[in-house]
């Protein structure tokens, strides 16, 4: 009949067995012993067990058991004959009547397949593929997996089942990635910080050696974990972009780097000296060249070469003016017998000296003293001429000596001529006379 399943009637034989050590017989599960007939009769569990089947399931009694099937399941009940069960031939209690083969009526029992199975054309129970027939209860977020006699609802990778729903698993919460993790529905993806590359396992990160792959630095590249550092050669400094190097102007760091002039060059610097000087081994200090000693001057034979700081001076022979007479290369004398010498210094001595520009003051630069000391005489020292700027003064240091003191720094180049006078006073013989040192001071251009 279309739409109705055929139910095959079956006969279940109940066995009546003696109880060990007891003459009383026992029946198999699902049957009960009828003491009057001595036969094992089926127990109707649908009547004796409360709520044997629950919900939309109905209870169908079977010989020796029962089935729970959907109430909407159509059942065809065909007649079948139930053979007699074989009686137990062993001893019985004396009160029991003699056993005889009872007559069972012909009953109709349905053959029903268990839930999840269906009858095929050969009246065999075969599994129902609920997934293929779309008769499952899995929701769209789940996957139906057929099993023997049923099915299961499962979730795809990256989801887990919670209260009948497939919820995305946040893999990033469990530290699947070594560095950066991005959760996506049903999966996740790992990425790395700048300076790293993702390994083949898709999870761990490996440092990128930027110096070996691209060498972004202009000069020296030093690889670090996850990055790199650019370094510059000596004499260069790293620019703000961290990649390029610019020349370092060492000369701008300090004015004392070189004694004279600092010359900057790409990556370095050097010190230079003005003409008349040479650079010392420390590569910063300048030393005067003695042109007179090395005969590297332009003085003629009549002139005297006088070395100065950074140069030289060709000094002409002295000329003694009337009434003075030249008595040596640097001395003029006024004869006492000459009436014109009465109020003039007895001698004029020519001396030369040099000082550096900007010399610190006060500074003792020249000493003057009497060569002969007469009884009853005393001496007075003074600057007779040339000190209009009040840059010097005479300090008497003893009865017959005095020192010329420079009181103000003098910037060169400059030439100064001072007449230093020593006055001799002798009260015993009522004598007063004087001598002069004509001092020529050459101030150099540089302070060294």
Swiss-Prot record:
Result of mutating residue 227 to P? In ARCL1A; decreases expression; produces protein misfolding; abolishes secretion; reduces interaction with ELN; increases homodimerization; impairs elastic fiber development
Principal localization reads secreted
- Name the reported effect of residue 124 to P: In ARMD3; almost abolishes secretion; no effect on homodimerization
Q: List the disulfide bonds.
A: 46-59, 53-68, 131-144, 138-153, 155-166, 172-181, 177-190, 192-205, 211-221, 217-230, 232-245, 251-262, 258-271, 273-286, 292-305, 299-314, 320-332
Cellular location of this protein? Secreted; Secreted, Extracellular space, Extracellular matrix
Supply the alphabetized keyword list: Age-related macular degeneration, Calcium, Cell adhesion, Charcot-Marie-Tooth disease, Disease variant, Disulfide bond, EGF-like domain, Extracellular matrix, Glycoprotein, Neurodegeneration, Neuropathy, Repeat, Secreted, Signal
The molecular function terms of the Gene Ontology recorded here are:
calcium ion binding; integrin binding; protein homodimerization activity
List all annotated glycosylation positions: 283, 296
Q: Give a short account of its post-translational modification.
A: N-glycosylated.
Q: What does this protein do?
A: Essential for elastic fiber formation, is involved in the assembly of continuous elastin (ELN) polymer and promotes the interaction of microfibrils and ELN. Stabilizes and organizes elastic fibers in the skin, lung and vasculature. Promotes adhesion of endothelial cells through interaction of integrins and the RGD motif. Vascular ligand for integrin receptors which may play a role in vascular development and remodeling. May act as an adapter that mediates the interaction between FBN1 and ELN.
Q: Subunit arrangement? A: Homodimer. Monomer, homodimerizes in presence of Ca(2+). Interacts with ELN. Interacts (via N-terminus) with the integrins ITGAV/ITGB3, ITGAV/ITGB5 and ITGA9/ITGB1. Interacts with FBN1 (via N-terminal domain). Forms a ternary complex with ELN and FBN1. Interacts with EFEMP2 with moderate affinity. Interacts with LOXL1.
Which protein, by its recorded name, is this? Answer: Fibulin-5
- According to its UniProt entry, this protein's organism is Homo sapiens
- Its gene? FBLN5
């Amino acid at each position: 009949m279309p739409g109705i399943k055929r139910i095959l009637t079956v006969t279940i034989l109940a066995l009546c067995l003696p109880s060990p050590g007891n003459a009383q017989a026992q029946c198999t599960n699902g049957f009960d012993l009828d003491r009057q007939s001595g036969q094992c009769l089926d127990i109707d569990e649908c009547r004796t067990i409360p709520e044997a089947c629950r919900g939309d399931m109905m209870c169908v009694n079977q010989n020796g058991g029962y089935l729970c099937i959907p109430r909407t399941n159509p059942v065809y009940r065909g007649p079948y004959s139930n053979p007699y069960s074989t009686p137990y031939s062993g001893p019985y209690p004396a009160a029991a009547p003699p056993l005889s083969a009872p007559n069972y009526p012909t009953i109709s029992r349905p053959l029903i397949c268990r839930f999840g199975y269906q009858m095929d054309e050969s009246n065999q129970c075969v599994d129902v593929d609920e997934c293929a027939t779309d008769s499952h209860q899995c929701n769209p977020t789940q996957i139906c997996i057929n099993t023997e006699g049923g099915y299961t609802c499962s979730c795809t990778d990256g989801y887990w089942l919670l209260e009948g729903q497939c919820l995305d698993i946040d893999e990033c919460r469990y530290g699947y990635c070594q560095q950066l993790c991005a959760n996506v529905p049903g999966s996740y993806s790992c990425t790395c910080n700048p300076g790293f590359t993702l390994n083949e396992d898709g999870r761990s990160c490996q440092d990128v050696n930027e110096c070996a792959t691209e060498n972004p630095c202009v000069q020296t590249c030093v690889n670090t974990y996850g990055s790199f550092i650019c370094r510059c050669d000596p004499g260069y400094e790293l620019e703000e972009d961290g990649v390029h190097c610019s020349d370092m102007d060492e000369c701008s760091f300090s004015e004392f780097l070189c004694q004279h002039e600092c010359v900057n060059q790409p990556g370095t610097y050097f010190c230079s000296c003005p003409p008349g000087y040479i650079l010392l081994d420390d590569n910063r200090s300048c030393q005067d060249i003695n042109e007179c000693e090395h005969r590297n001057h332009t003085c003629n034979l009549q002139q005297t070469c006088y070395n100065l700081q950074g140069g030289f001076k060709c000094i002409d022979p002295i000329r003694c003016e009337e009434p003075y007479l030249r008595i040596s290369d640097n001395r003029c004398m006024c004869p006492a017998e000459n009436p014109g010498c009465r109020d003039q210094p007895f001698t004029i001595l020519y001396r030369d000296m040099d000082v550096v520009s900007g010399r610190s003051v006060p500074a003792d630069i020249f000493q003057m003293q009497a060569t002969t000391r007469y009884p009853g005489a005393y001496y007075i020292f003074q600057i007779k001429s040339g000190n209009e700027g009040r840059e010097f003064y005479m300090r008497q240091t003893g009865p017959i000596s005095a020192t010329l003191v420079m009181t103000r720094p003098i910037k060169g180049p400059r030439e100064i001529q001072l007449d230093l006078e020593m006055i001799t006073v002798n009260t015993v013989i009522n004598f007063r006379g004087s001598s002069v040192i004509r001092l020529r001071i050459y101030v150099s251009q540089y302070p060294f």
